[in-house]
Amino acid sequence: RQVSTPRFPAAVTEVTLPPGARVPYPAGAYAFIAQLVWVLSGQLTLADGPVVHALAAGDTFELGEPRPREFRNDGAGDCRYVVVVTRTATP
């Protein structure tokens, strides 16, 4: 669910990821953007290239340089998180 309006300088999106869901992104999806993930409830497993992070409610994670990533819900209930995206440069 898009939270921000088109006039706001960042895209703010609330996501609900059901149990067992996996969402992979190629490295190219992160070119020219900065991204912050904030977990509101549940558990989020974030594979950041070869490194795997287990995030819980209240945790935040700033994504660094572009690399393949996968968002997973390995928990028993829904995971709700917010993604904030800003542009870092013009392609």
Model-inferred region functions:
Residues R1-A27, A34, V84-V85, A89:
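A short glycine-rich, His/Asp/Glu-containing loop-to-beta-strand
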Residues E62-E65, R69, Y81-P91:
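Amphipathic alpha-helical interface segments
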Residues G49-P66:
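Short acidic-glycine-tyrosine-enriched beta hairpin
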Residues E14, A29-L46:
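Short, conserved beta-strand element in jelly-roll/cupin
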Residues F8, A76-G77:
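Short strand-connecting beta-turns/loops that link adjacent beta-strands
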